[in-house]
Curated annotation (Swiss-Prot):
Motif Q motif positions after renumbering to this chain: 14-42
Protein task: ATP-binding RNA helicase involved in the biogenesis of 60S ribosomal subunits. Binds 90S pre-ribosomal particles and dissociates from pre-60S ribosomal particles after processing of 27SB pre-rRNA. Required for the normal formation of 18S rRNA through the processing of pre-rRNAs at sites A0, A1 and A2, and the normal formation of 25S and 5.8S rRNAs through the processing of pre-rRNAs at sites C1 and C2.
Subunit structure: Component of pre-60S ribosomal complexes.
Domain note: The Q motif is unique to and characteristic of the DEAD box family of RNA helicases and controls ATP binding and hydrolysis.
Entry's Gene Ontology cellular component terms: 90S preribosome; nucleolus; nucleoplasm; preribosome, large subunit precursor
Coiled coil spans: 521-629
Keywords per UniProt: ATP-binding, Coiled coil, Helicase, Hydrolase, Nucleotide-binding, Nucleus, Ribosome biogenesis, RNA-binding, rRNA processing
Keyword Transmembrane helix: no
Keyword rRNA processing found: yes
EC number: 3.6.4.13
SUPFAM superfamilies associated with the record: P-loop containing nucleoside triphosphate hydrolases
Protein name as catalogued: ATP-dependent rRNA helicase spb4
Length: 638
């Protein structure tokens, strides 16, 4: 990569950019409250506007969005002539629906200060009609947002054909579907710029193939910008994207030593707290109460979608009524995700977003004061992105990662090596045994009230363990070191699930809970009705329903065991016959002929071997008889 050229001025004033920004852009950023550029904006905007490919790595919350939106908009509005109908001039790709929506909202806020573009956007948002008639010589930016799950591909194409947007903000899958249409054009004469936001995530395996298909549909002669908080960890993949001698912009933050060794904002305090499993959830309440002033918005990260579903039921009971807890994960339907996201963003009372890594990247949620990582991320790269939801744009923020005592504490040194140092949580927190036991009983009370919540908890625990076992720092997060009983009690489980990992566990899998599983009911009447019907059917068929592991009957007669073995052998033989019949039916006549010849040859060999074994047995018997006869005692003649 080409080195970054020296800047002509040390000023970060917006009017000092070279080439100069348009007057309406200066008005827009001033109205948004941005008095001067952030370091990443001061570095990236001039380069991107000067027709350079850029790879931008900057700490999260440093203003990367405007770093690419302003150059893209300026480029489209400085063309010699408007882009042709149904031709695309620029594309911004984002890994998630939420982040794409956020970029689109910032874009429309920016374009509100450009009269021609604002007129088109306002019309398209209020009426489902083609864009208003303007002089064909008027340059304007017409954006379209493409999100999977919110509209159908046919609806997106219809909107594209009606409004003829020249700037697309999209998630990868939906963008590829639109570009695959013969009615959408991206020729070299029209297409100008491609932006990959959160570039390292877009280049992950889940998006790699889709991204490659998108790039095949775009001209190679284009300006490309890659923006992320950790671009350096995907350099090999970035080079293959097709950038031409890109300029790399790296913006870091000075640590306490004065060296540029941190990859997070200086306004963000990153800490860790060590708690045993039973103390983790009660400690959350202590954390919330220790932060002053009380956090208006907090984000709690867990590792799985099932974990969000289950903990969203029990955590409010442990935390109390002072905070509104809102769940969000990637398996929610698109409308539920958007609804819950908006609830959190617009919440006036203290709110907590309980989420997975779907909310860890790029989202600029205002006023997030606290981030708690209940589960450390399985991918260490995600750690910095989770922390970065707080402390954005200079606002003070606090991040806490919860660790179990022992080997997990080595994660602190691991993060230090990765230039994301964490300090001990500044306020000592001690969770008493009585408080931990009370939290367990509080959770179990709601679990006992509805068998559906029990099922949800069992699923969530298994899912959590699967995620834990796949941690990339596997030498630190070891399944063998887990406190099973402590974890089960912490989660409010009534028993430990059946899992291969518990095969050699010698502890109490019932967790000290006595339950009548036959009478343990679902609140949902239909589910309970089905359960009772199944219970009745099993009772009538002589089977006993139990959720515990079946214990062997120590008084079973040998004859019953022999009968069971005979039944199994018979079933095995029948299965083998069916498989052989299916194999025979698939054969050609020639194959059948060869198979018969082979079988006949094998029969001859078997017969020959059996005859040899028979002769050997006969000879052995004769030798034995002779030996026994020779040893007889002589008793004399008659």
């Amino acid at each position: 990569m080409a080195p970054k050229p020296p800047s002509g001025t040390s000023s970060r004033a917006w009017d000092a950019v070279n080439p100069p920004l348009s007057e309406w852009v200066l008005d827009a950023v001033s109205s948004m409250g941005f008095t001067r550029m952030t370091p990443v904006q001061a570095s990236a905007i001039p380069l991107f506007m000067a027709h350079k490919d850029v790879v931008v790595e900057a700490v999260t919350g440093s203003g990367k969005t405007l770093s690419f939106l302003i150059p893209v908009v300026e480029k489209l509005l400085r063309l010699e002539e408007p882009i042709k109908k149904h031709h695309v001039g620029a594309i911004i790709v984002s890994p998630t629906r939420e982040l794409a929506s956020q970029i689109y909202n910032v874009l429309t806020s920016l374009l509100a200060f450009h009269p021609a573009s604002a007129a088109v956007i306002n019309t398209s948002e209020t009426e489902d009609v083609p864009r208003p008639k303007h002089s064909s010589s008027v340059l304007r930016v017409v954006p379209q947002l493409l999100l999977g799950g919110s509209t159908s591909p046919a609806e997106d194409l219809s909107t594209f054909l009606k409004r003829s947007p020249n700037l697309l903000v999209a998630t990868p899958g939906r963008l590829l579907e639109l570009l695959s249409s013969p009615h959408v054009y991206c020729p070299q004469s029209s297409f100008e710029m491609l932006v990959l936001d959160e570039a390292d995530r877009l280049l992950d395996l889940g998006f790699k193939e889709t991204l490659q298909n998108i790039l095949r549909r775009l001209p190679k002669q284009r300006r490309t910008g890659l923006f992320s908080a950790s671009v350096s960890e995907a350099v090999d993949q970035i080079v293959r994207v097709g950038l031409r001698n890109p300029v790399k912009v790296v913006v870091k933050v000075k640590g306490a030593s004065g060296v540029d060794d941190k990859r997070t904002p200086a306004s963000l305090q990153m800490t860790y707290l060590t708690q045993p499993p039973t103390g983790k959830f009660p400690a959350l309440k202590h954390i919330l109460n220790s932060v002053q002033p009380t956090p208006s918005k907090s984000i709690f990260f867990v590792s799985t979608c099932s974990g969000v579903d289950y903990l969203s039921v029990i955590l409010p009971l442990i935390l109390g009524n002072d905070f509104q807890l809102i769940p969000l994960h990637g398996k929610h339907p698109a409308n539920v995700r958007q609804k819950n996201f908006n609830r959190f963003v617009n919440a006036h009372n203290p709110a907590i977003l309980l989420t997975t890594d779907v909310a860890s990247r790029g989202l600029d949620i205002p006023s997030v004061d606290l981030v708690v990582q209940i589960d450390p991320p399985s991918d260490p790269k995600t750690f910095i992105h989770r922390c970065g939801r707080a402390g954005r744009a200079g606002r003070r923020g606090l991040s806490v990662v919860l660790l179990h005592p022992g080997r997990e504490e080595d994660y602190v040194s691991f993060l230090e090596v990765r230039k994301t140092p964490v300090a001990p949580f500044p306020h000592p927190i001690t969770v008493s045994d009585a408080e931990a036991a009370a939290a367990t009983e509080t959770a179990r009370k709601v679990v006992k009230a509805d068998r559906a919540i029990h099922d949800r908890g069992q699923k969530a625990f298994v899912s959590w363990l699967r995620s834990y076992s796949k941690h990339q720092a596997s030498s630190i997060f070891r399944v063998a070191d887990l406190d099973w009983e402590g974890l089960g009690k912490a989660w409010g489980l009534l028993k430990l699930p059946k899992m291969p990992e518990l095969k050699n566990f010698k502890g109490d899998k019932t967790l000290g809970v006595q339950m009548d599983w036959d009478t343990y009911a679902y609140k949902d009447k239909q589910r309970e009705k089905r359960r009772l019907e199944l219970l009745q059917e099993m009772a009538e068929s002589g089977q006993q329903q139990t959720t515990n592991k079946k214990r062997p009957n120590e008084t079973v007669a040998w004859s019953n065991n022999a009968e069971n073995r005979n039944k199994k052998a018979k079933r095995r033989d029948m299965k083998q016959v069916r498989q052989e019949r299916k194999r025979w039916e698939k054969m050609t006549e020639e194959e059948k002929k060869k198979a018969l010849e082979t079988e006949q040859m094998l029969e001859q060999i078997r017969a020959k071997n059996e005859e040899q074994r028979r002769l050997k047995r006969a000879a052995a018997k004769a030798d034995k008889d002779a030996e026994e006869g020779g040893d007889e005692e002589f008793t004399g003649f008659d």
